[in-house]
Every structure is written in C-alpha cells, then in structure tokens.
C-alpha cells in the first residue's frame, strides 16, 4: 500500500488506518537525505513509533539511507495483557491449526475435549473475530468458521482487560486479521502426508500399521493485482484440504444389523453373529473366539477428521482515501468422536458435520489525515449436523436392542446410534466505526453494531414406528417421534443485539491511558411460562373441560370464568392469573379427555405464556501504562465485562415438556430470561527490557465472575420435578504470568512463559446441579468454590526457532503443565465420592513438537522440504483417568466386575485409548513458492 502524511513544524506525523503487517516507511525533505526504514511492524490497536534521523546535504537530492527497524521489546502503549503472532511466526512453528497457536499463549489452556480456555474461564467465554467481525457461534460459543493458518496475517490474543470496542466476552478476545493481495503476484502450494509412529500398540489398536496416506494435506494460495485493473484492485485466495484418519481405531467385526444373544447364563449357549457370518450364528463364546482368530477384520478410523477451508479477499482502492473490500471464508468439517462401546461395531457411530460461511463487505473512507471511518456488513451462517444417516427413515437404522442389550462392560455387537441433531444459525451484521486523532494526545474511537440472528434447531431420536393403535410395528421400522414427545424438539428463534461504544486513547509523555465504555442491548425474542409450576406447552397440568361445566382444572385446582363483554377469560382461583391461548399461535388447549379446544369454544384476555425480557448493560473500562524508564513500563487495567447467555441455554426444550415420573428429575429447560453473565477483571503488569536482547514481563491478575449459568430445581402442581437454567453459578480466577522474550539476532529467537493460575467456582458446567441430583445416589450440588474441571495450575511453554537465513531452520515447542482435577470415587460405576469435588489431580503432562526445513531452488522456483513431528517423545499423557484410582491404566472396578456378557474381555473394556493424548505424529511435506 502507498499511504503517507506530512509533518508539522515539530516533525510530528501520524499515519492512520494501516492494516497489520510489515512496511517500509520513507521520509524525505528538501535539503536532507532521504531515509528509508524497513521491516516496520504494525499491529492491531498499537502505536508504532518510527523516528527519522535526517542529515542535511548540499544537493537537493542526496544519498538515500536505509535503516532496518527492530521490533521494540517493550510496547509502551500496552495497557493490558495481549499476545501478537504474525504470519512469519506461524510459518516457523510446528503447529497445525488455530488452536495449536492459541495454546502457546500465556494464560491459555486446552481441555480434554480440545476446547480453548483463557485465564480459567469457560470455553464459551471467548470472542472470536476475523477482520473485526465476530465469527463466534452464539448457540454454543464456539468458532463458527475455520481459518487456515496460511491465511492469517496477524493473530492477536487479548487475555487481560480489553478495550470498550470488544464485547460479548468474559475471558478473552481472539482477533484474526486475514491476508490481502499486494501489488505483485505471489503464490505457493504445500503438500504433506504422514501417519502415527508410536510404540504404544498396547493402548492404540493397530497403531503399528503405518500408512503414509493416513494423513494428507494440500493447500495453496495466490495473490496479486487483478488483470486489467492496474494496481487498484488486488486479490488474495487460499484453499486447504486436510484428511486425517486419526489415532483411535476400531475393528469392523460386527455390522449394525448384526444381532447376538448373550442372555443365557451359560456362555456355551450364547448365539453370536458377526459381519462375516451373514444370517447364520455361532453357538458358544469359545467357539466364536476360536473362529474370530482365523478372520481378518477391517480397521476403521473412529476419530477421523476431514476439513475443507476456502478463503478469499478482493480489495478495490477506489481513490487514495477510499477502499472497498469483500472477504469470504468457508469451511466444511466432517468428523467422528471416539465411542469406546462401538469399538467392534464402528459403522454404527454417528458422524458430525460443521459448515461455516461468512461474507464481509467493508468500506473504509479517510475523511482527512487524522480521521477515517469503516462501514462493515456481514452475513454469517453456521450449521451443525449430527447423525448416522441423513434420512431418518433410512432402513439401515435398526432397533436399539441390537447394540447388545446394554450389558455391563460389553462392546456393542450391533445396533446404531439413532440421535439426529440439526441446527443452523444465520447472522446479519452491520457495524460502523469512526477513528479520529483529534490532537497529538487523544485518539477517539466510537462505534455502533447491530446483529440479527435466526436460529433453526431440531433434534430427535429415531424410534420404532407404531401403528394406529399405538403398537410397535414388527419388524422394526424407523420413525420420528411426534413434536409433543420428550425426545423431539424443534424451534425457530430470532433474537437481536445492539451495541455502542466510545473509547479514548490518551498518549501523554508520562503515561498512556485507554478509557472507554460500551452499552449492550439484547432481546432473546423468546417465551416463558407464566407459572413455572405448570410450564408445559403441549400438555399442561391444568387443562380444562369447558363442556363439562366443572370449575376445576385437571388437577382439581379451582378456576373461574370471568365474563368480560361476552368473552370467557379463565382465572386461576389460586393465583388470580388469567390465561388465554398459549404461544406460539399454533399451540392449543385441550380438555381432560385430550380433545383440542378450538378458538370458537372460548376467548380469553390473559396469557399462559409471556415474552422474554430484553437486557441492557453498561461496561466501563480503563487501562493505564506508565513508562518507568526508556526500557520499562508498568500497566494496569480494570473493567466490567458482560456476555449474553448462549442460545443453547436460552431455548432448550421449547415446548417446556416435563418427563413425568412420580417426582423423579429427568427434564432440563432453557430460560429466555437469563441475565448477562458478568466478570470484573483487574490486572497489573510490568514490561522490562534487560540488556539489548531480552525482554521480561510479569503480570498478576484477578477475575471475579458471577451470574454464570447454572440450574435450579422446580416442583410442579403434579409433584413432578424439572430443572431450568438460571443465573446462579459463580467463580474466581487469580494468577501470575512471567514471560521471557529472547531475540539475540534475526536468526534465533526464544520465548518462555510460566503461568501460575487458580480457577475456582461452584460448578464447571451449567448442568452440574441437574446432573448431581440425577446421580445414583443423588448428591447435593456444590455451593463452595472448588477447582474447575479445566484448572491447570502450573503451565510452562517454550518456543525456540533458529534459521540460517533462508537456507535451513529448526523449530521446537515444549509444553509442561500440571494435570487437571478430578473427583475421586470409591468405585466409578457406583458414583460414590470418596472426597470433595475435584480434590485430586491427574498426572503431569509434557510434550515436545519439532519442525525442520531445508530451502532449495531450481527451475526459477523456490522449494522448501520440511518435516514436523508432534509429540516427539511419544509421551503417554493422561487427559482422563479412572476416578477410583486416579490412574489412566487401572480401575478398581475391574476387581468387582462380573463376567462380561459379550465377546470382549474386561481388560479390553478397561483399556481406554481415549484417556491418552495423541501419540507421536510425523508429517513430511514440500512447499513450492512462486
């Protein structure tokens, strides 16, 4: 890009609205040498200072002087903790995806499911942005579209207090700036393949069968000017396809429609059918085991992943002050999650699909050298589907009985997982921001943002079809339960969100201050039961029989008719509440016999349901940086941070159905009236340069978290119980981070950080209280603060890179951390706790990742041959343990378990490969640049 500015009489100048990246800045003045400064790094929301030592010359045009800029070790306008990772840094790291990069940042950890946690918060408390646009799926708080590492220009992770322009996050902000095209053509293709090389064949089935095609990746990018448009229009395009069979495998010994019988007390009478036997069966367990030894069954990947990601950006520089761009991201992910019980029947497991798309037109207009605005629009669609067969009436679905009858410690010898989930979130966004450097001291930024969501959701369980009399049809035929059933939920909701903010960056000689505030408005556009003791939309307890003339609800609680202008309003004699037709408009009342009451039967003035409340929140924030020397600065930040509830918790169980069972607890409901979750965050930190090449940073932080989502228990008129989400959970996080940044030369760099952190709360999951009371035996929900499930108290990260120019290079990442907590039990299957919740720790975890490359040139092209090794030492890190022993390789349950009614042994059942981290993975590849 070519942008510039004129200085004032003091030589002061500003250049605003530069995209993050690396630049060359040139200063010229009549009577002085021209000075060019190269390798100037520009980062998001940071001020980069470039001074020019001009020397006078006799001639009007003197010799040009070139200076190479060094990235400052101390960023003096830093007022909170953040990490910046540039595209050249990513290229040198042995990393695969965005999560691998995030995990290396101080205060960031990943749990056993791979979810990202920043400074001890829940995984849904992180905001993800691409080019200033949110790509966080509001249903579950996850990333809605994947961005390939090769398409990232700069990544910023804010783990401390963030400015007022950032909202809907409690723990941190991950902001990605994507690449855009330049004035010259640039492209490249990378191909690599690999597999797992591990000695842990006693844990991972068939891991010693090395297949170089088990992992394959191909990606490429191309950028430059669009032909016929000169340098006004440029483009960037990137594509990636990734296919990994995974490291957890099963054996195709049984097919979903196989049916075995293990009911006989004598295993000599068991009838066993596997995939090689067709419709015939072998009688007797030992006879079958002898037969199976003679057969070779197929290996089937059970945690495979396929990804396709596409990225593009078209940039049109209409004038020197006006730029218009359109960016697009598309990702398609197909994966499976390992289910140990299906190890011998892997074809019966469901598949999961994630599809994301975002399109973002952006107009940037510089009104003057000191003021510009951006106008952004975005269309984002995220769809998540989970099923075995897309058609729920697919005849390949079988009776759930074929899984093996649910025998204890037995692998499934047939059957299918019959759950279906399909949800789609569409977001329309408009955003307007203005930035103005009103003087040398103050940079004002303000903005408005509007979002309109549409959420479509449906989930059900494929069940056996029934005839008109309600009898199950034999043989099995798949069917969808009626919408009024407990195992079928469907809804469409259209919430809206609006926000506004203003912030001022005050740069004084003595200090830098970031101060601001934001206002957030959210309307869930949901409905809530008027009376929580009778919430059901499809089957209310207090149904009525108008025709009988009785003045009692179905549960014998009195009501009265209240004539008003000839209408018939129903008034509850106990509460005085008036009721009309329930919402939505297609819902009905029924009488005691189950007959539908039509509109003509009665008219009313009250309401069985009420609309949810809108929420407004104000968040003040301040950050201060105080330079103590020319090589050091102290910073402090304090702020209030709010986040709306995820849609999952707002709208769960939209018909408010209750699974009746004589007072037992079996139902959980959403709550469209949930309040915003709240965090008060403060931190204080020190940046210090030591010598010429070493930087030290120390940060202490504390977070007080309340209004988190939990569950409360409610009893109905019919003495049934149900749970619903409410704002009652709480927690706190405190810790210290120490980081060393060593940069002795351009060839070598090393970064080391250590985090001591304690994350505590009364619950790790919004469902915790619900699950506690449903346990056998039930237990009281936790009210004291205990370590959270992802609490990782000690974390040490090391990132070392060495490159000999562009010839060859090495990279090493080391990670060491204490294990996460678990709750000890006397016996895992009994669920009786032997101590407090999360009172014990899993073993220490250690991992090394390695990368090496060698550059080659021939035929006018540049090539790079590289190798990446993940888990270099093939460590068996435990990510889960048996709660009865705290060990990953032994459970005391095996001492008390009876004979397995199935074809597997107890040892096979209690060998849990899913309890271990990924074994050693080796990838070899080639990059061609042109």
Put a short name on every predicted segment.
Residues 807-811, 815-829, 845-847, 854-930:
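C-terminal beta-signal and adjacent terminal beta-strands/loops
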Residues 105, 148-188, 219-221, 229:
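A beta-strand signature from Gram-negative outer-membrane beta-barrel systems
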Residues 1-64, 68, 73:
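Periplasm-facing N-terminal accessory domains of Gram-negative outer-membrane beta-barrel systems
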Residues 211-334, 354-370, 620:
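Transmembrane beta-barrel wall of Gram-negative outer-membrane proteins
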Residues 16, 133-160, 202-213, 220, ...:
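Short acidic/polar hinge/loop motifs at secondary-structure boundaries
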Residues 64, 374, 378, 627, ...:
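Membrane-embedded beta-barrel scaffold of Gram-negative outer-membrane proteins
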